[in-house]
Amino acid sequence: MRVCKHVSCAGQNGTPILMDIRRLKSFIVIVDSGSITRAADLLHIAQPALSQQLAALEEHFGHKLLIRSQQGVSMTDAGHAVYRHAQIILRQMEQAQADASAAGNSLAGRVSVGLVPFSSAATLSVDLLAETRKRHPGILLHLTESVGQTYSQMIMNGRLEMALLHGTGPIKGVRFEPILSEEFFLVAHRDFAIEADAKPVSVNTLDGIPLLLPPAYNFVRRAVDTAFTRTRTNLKVVAEVEIVRTLARAVGSGLGATIMPKAIADRIVSESSEPLICRLVSPRIEETLSLCVSDQNPLSEPALAVRDILLELTARLKG
């Protein structure tokens, strides 16, 4: 099937003109790679030709879109706006292609989902993939789990359709749907002389205990920092770890204890070859897990199907 390579949009004077969609793709690659030179290599085109495409885009929109420097390129305010719309346009074109190809058949298309690490969301990835493949084999699921990305920004830019993350907003351009409250648990080796008790362990009793936690920008660390500050308890972080598997091995080896949401605490206990103490923390530390989508761009049919599966899986965690 022949796919149209142009989109119709208004020029600076408001007159509808045709734009080669490849220019939008090229613009996205330039921004994502951070360099026109790298983008030219990735796109397998000459750098002067790519620069001409960028110049044509800037002429069309009547604004400078990128600022070049020795460090690479950065977007202007106009560039941010064009980047966001370019992502949406290309996603809609891809979905139109998938819908046309699957007309009369099952759902098809690409759906991007962000799952925040160190949370129940991170434990759902395999189940989400399995259920999506089982129910909608035509859907290409793109899962990302990263501490270095701002998922809300990626949703606004059209790079993600949805994300499970902590917080309830508000963030302009993103709609938050609270779906789960996560309680935090202490996980420690028996050598730390913490009793295996069903009762919550007081934060005050953890004064000076060596802890393994994520860096300060991580939501887990912020929640723990707040709890220790409020109870005027000395927080002793001996290492900052952002890899759950490494964290599990370190806790199991007695290198330090940790405080994590229940889903991650359970995973650490299950992966350890050593018996570990796992107790709820008091005063209670908890964070709200929300399903986030754009409040401006409606979800595609495939994305709605994936959203339904996500809600089913998180409902199981509550039970």
Question: Where are each of the predicted segments found?
Answer:
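Short helix-boundary/capping micro-motifs
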Residues: I28-A46
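A short LG(V/I)-centered, amphipathic sequence patch enriched
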Residues: E58-D77
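Alpha-helical linker/hinge and terminal dimerization helices associated
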Residues: H60-F61, V82-G104, V306
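Central regulatory/effector-binding core of bacterial HTH transcription factors
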Residues: R110-I171
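Secondary-structure junction motif
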Residues: A122-T123, V201, P210-T231, L299-R307, ...
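Hydrophobic hinge/microswitch elements
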Residues: T150-Y151, M156-L160, L165-H166, Y217-I277
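Flexible hinge/capping segments at coil-to-helix
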Residues: V174-L211
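A late-sequence structural motif
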Residues: L276-G319
